[in-house]
Structure formats: C-alpha cells, structure tokens
Amino acid sequence: LSSWGFDARVSEGFCPIPALGWTAAHDEGVIGAVMIGASGAPAGYQGVCVRDANGLIAPGEFLARVESLVPGEASDSRGACGSAALLDTYISELERLVDADAISAARPRIVVDPMYGTSRGILAGMLRRLGADVIEIHGDDRTDFAGLHPRPVEPWVDDCEQAVMSSGACAGLVLDGDADRIGLVDEKGRFVSTHRLYALVMGHLVETRGMSGRVAMPLNGSTYV
C-alpha cells in the first residue's frame, strides 16, 4: 500500500477488528482499514477483511473493484510504513461505557477465552482493571491454534465451559479469532450463542433498564430479538 502512495500504518500489536473499524470511523484522516486474518477458520486459512471510512464492512461492489485491481504477481517494490497505536483510545471508550463501580464492587470471577486470537490479553486486561477476577485460557502464542477452530460455537467452547465449572466463575466469555463475535458460558457451564446473547441483552435493556426505541440487528440474529 505504501509503494502505491498510501500513508499506510501497521498496528503496534494485536488488534481486534472492532478496534480497527472504530479507528477508521473516528479518525478523519483514515479512508479505510485492512485486516489480514481468517476470523473463525482454522490456523491454515488466511484472508483479507476490508473496512471503509465509516468502519463498516466494505460493500461487495467495492470489494469486486479492489480485487480486479490486484495484480497477478506480487510487486517487489516496498514503501516505508509507520506504526499506529490503535487500542488505547478504543479501550478507554469501552471502559467509559460500562459501570466500573458496579463491576469493582461485585468482583465477579470471569473466564475469558480469546481462542488464541487477536483479543488475547486485551479483554482480560480490561476486565481486571475494572476489578474483575479474570482467568484467561487459550491466551498464549500458538500459531497453529492448538488445532482449535476459533469460533464461539460448540464444540470449540468446551474448554471454556469446563473452566467456568472448575473455577466457580460466574460466566465465561468466548471470542472468535478476530474478536468480532462473542459467546457466553453461564455459571452452570451452559453455552449461550451470540444470537441468544443479543436477545438477553435486549431483554435486560427493556425490562430492567426501562429503555425503548428502535433496534437494528443483523438478519441472522433478528428472529431472536
């Protein structure tokens, strides 16, 4: 990208795709973002995820145009590129949105399973700063993912279910490889899918918090809500 005249920056460390999209949306100097990864696919897979200047998944027609411009062979030319700290501001914003005092007072024990993906150390670290007692599994550096498919679905959440039960945690949080999907394990070791989790959150906001208004949901999860 630098060799083609773009001011390209590379993340200083692991970067969950929500942080990448958030940066693209909130930095007026950014026209788009690219992540190399394979989401929930096994370690042998690789792909490219493109976000537009609004931090959203680029539409198909735009991606088709980009793909048509990709040369058949890689260029030998390389331009200079800088680095960017993408996490600090994003994490600060997340911490601002939650009730830190309530979390600190409750000191919940939570199992976090980043599935060897981009969120390792990040979500666990944030929860610890907020006062939670956190147990992180699958957080070490394994380029082969130890054979795990980093998807928050059965049977790949079995280790988190067992960790919740054995540690007496109140919940487990399971994220996929690029950390844009999350699943929940309850205190009894039962898995709650991403779509059902959306419905639980909506129920809490309406029934407990008394909130009302319009809700936008992906089509694949809207029937639950």
Model-derived regions, located:
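Active-site flanking residues adjacent to catalytic metal/cofactor-binding acidic residues
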Residues: 36, 112-115, 175-177, 217
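Short, charged/polar, Gly/Pro-enriched secondary-structure boundary elements
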Residues: 26, 56-59, 190-192
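Short, well-ordered alpha-helical microsegments
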Residues: 17-20, 119-120, 224-225
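Gly/Ser/Thr-enriched, mixed-charge loops and adjacent short helices
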Residues: 46-167
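Short Gly/Thr/Asp-enriched flexible loops that form oxyanion-binding sites at enzyme active sites
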Residues: 1, 43-53, 122-123, 177-199, ...
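N-terminal small/polar loop signature for handling phosphorylated ligands or for N-terminal nucleophile
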Residues: 1-45, 125-185
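Hydrophobic "anchor" residues on beta-strands that sit immediately upstream
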Residues: 109, 172, 214
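Proline/glycine-rich low-complexity loops and linkers
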Residues: 2, 10-12, 64-92, 96, ...
